[in-house]
From Swiss-Prot:
Name this protein carries in UniProt: Bifunctional protein PyrR
Motif annotated as PRPP-binding, chain positions: 97-109
SUPFAM superfamilies (alphabetical): PRTase-like
InterPro entries registered for this protein in UniProt: PRibTrfase_dom, PRTase-like, PyrR, PyrR_bifunctional
Entry superkingdom: Bacteria
GO biological process per UniProt: regulation of DNA-templated transcription
UniProt: substrate binding residues: 39-40, 101-109, 134, 158
Pfam families in the record: Pribosyltran (PF00156)
Native source species: Haemophilus ducreyi (strain 35000HP / ATCC 700724)
Protein function: Regulates the transcription of the pyrimidine nucleotide (pyr) operon in response to exogenous pyrimidines.
A GO term for molecular function: uracil phosphoribosyltransferase activity
Family: Belongs to the purine/pyrimidine phosphoribosyltransferase family. PyrR subfamily.
Amino acid sequence: MEKIIIDTEQFQRTISRISHQIIEKHAILDNIILVGIKRRGAEIAEMLQKRISELAQISLPLMALDITFYRDDLNLTSKDPVYTGVEHQLNIEGKTVILIDDVLFTGRTIRAALDALLDFGRAKRIELVILVDRGHRELPIRADYVGKNIPTALNEQVQVRTEHYDGVSQVALIHSTNG
């Protein structure tokens, strides 16, 4: 069973609200880098970059981060995984990095992303943007900017859909009858 919990219009309003919050929090945007966790976090980062550019007339640097090599909760098929890293590596030394992902659940994806970012240098500060926080944390991770808090049961799944990958921007709550 599926329920749309954020429709396309709400999705765009959420991107706009988070963009406004980032601008309001940072008087100067010059030292900010947006880092989106592949796949949907990177697309959300692109949406934020575009909206911030429209609002503040500044194009923030953007980096897409692949954290597969850093994860501790996936079974890898090879003992020597291929690390693809980032599409465009930026110098994060002394910068404020705004890390962006679609769903915050256990916190393990964010922990892996933090490990990956540390390999690029020492950021002055790292802030976290999450489109949907569904609870059930296993690690002490908290987002600085949250699109929507949606408490879920463990047998539910939050599915963020984006234009690039799914042809529509929305969030669905999927209830599994198996568990």
